[in-house]
Amino acid sequence: MNYAYPDEKGHYGIYGGRYVPETLMQSVLELEEAYKEAMEDEAFQKELNHYLKTYVGRETPLYYAENMTKYCGGAKIYLKREDLNHTGAHKINNTIGQALLAVRMGKKKVVAETGAGQHGVATATVCALLGLECVIFMGEEDVRRQKLNVFRMELLGAKVESVAAGSGTLKDAVNEALRYWVSHVHDTHYIMGSVLGPHPFPQIVRDFQSVIGKETKKQYEALEGKLPEAVVACIGGGSNAMGMFYPFVHDEEVALYGVEAAGKGVHTEQHAATLTKGSVGVLHGSMMYLLQNEEGQIQEAHSISAGLDYPGVGPEHSLLKDIGRVSYHSITDDEALEAFQLLTKKEGIIPALESSHAVAYALKLAAQMKKDEGLVICLSGRGDKDVESIKRYMEEV
């Protein structure tokens, strides 16, 4: 399979690109230049690997979930344990890389957006480590859902700005963070949290996250002497999935499955299943599949999980859907909750609600596969942050 994206203009087929105001174009080009140089600099790579190993705690284990495997009665189920990273999710793979890049570019301050608060915490964490000032924009609704993470960010020295505009969720936080970046661009780096935004952000985030898939490949081959038959990851903006899928894209014998949030059901208005129900448009500087109405107004995304309710999806996922290399599915709030409880009770591992969507789909898939086949789930984060809201949800039900 001939797959070489993005092209030099930052396009993934028709997707991606740089739809930014003139005021940002210079910074985006400067970032691309700095990133290319850093990637070719052995000293930068060495420093990054040092922090990934000694600070983040990589490599993360590839765990054979024997009880889940027996329960499904099909393929062997493995979990790539991104929940065991420092800060409890995959997000820090990207924030540590981008923060080192910010230091290299001579920036003193970092701005970021956050939904569930995981990216905010991971950003505040690396800013504390590297002595950078940190401003985090978070939707008002998410601030309410994720009080603990807000307190964590403040403990780490970040300034958290609550965004009341729009629906008070991730999309609105991104708008405000971009606005802030435009007016502080001389001394501030924007750490985008997912494979979104104008080029080179989707590529930078993918590259820093692809440590997940590279490790998985090596670990699975060491354990089973072959590659897995299937790999499953959840998708909001799509960074954990892109990090897991990218190293497997050329291995066509490995089936790749992305799992979106179906919320209350894709037949309702309350879901975040962009690739299932969306159409092509431009949001936050990039062309991608979006949830929008006929007038092109962005629709609200809904999911029980704060990290999946983004109304768009990364440009590279948009391309991978079109060329059929990844197949995309969706899981409802209720199915994700069921999978959350099942994994917790069967394996003693409390997954994030985001990751629970991947677990739910993987269970259906594993049951249809043969016993000598293998399936890997990207367990993108731990569920501590969700326990409180799950308790509320279960009490209401």
UniProtKB/Swiss-Prot annotation:
Reactions accelerated catalytically: (1S,2R)-1-C-(indol-3-yl)glycerol 3-phosphate + L-serine = D-glyceraldehyde 3-phosphate + L-tryptophan + H2O
GO (cellular component) term, any one: cytoplasm
Pathways involved: Amino-acid biosynthesis; L-tryptophan biosynthesis; L-tryptophan from chorismate: step 5/5
InterPro entries registered for this protein in UniProt: Trp_synth_b_CS, Trp_synth_beta, Trp_synth_beta/beta-like, TrpB-like_PALP, TrpB-like_PALP_sf
Amino-acid biosynthesis among keywords: yes
Named cofactor requirement(s): pyridoxal 5'-phosphate
Functional note: The beta subunit is responsible for the synthesis of L-tryptophan from indole and L-serine.
Family named by the database record: Belongs to the TrpB family.
Protein name: Tryptophan synthase beta chain
Source species of the chain: Bacillus cereus (strain ATCC 10987 / NRS 248)
Gene: trpB
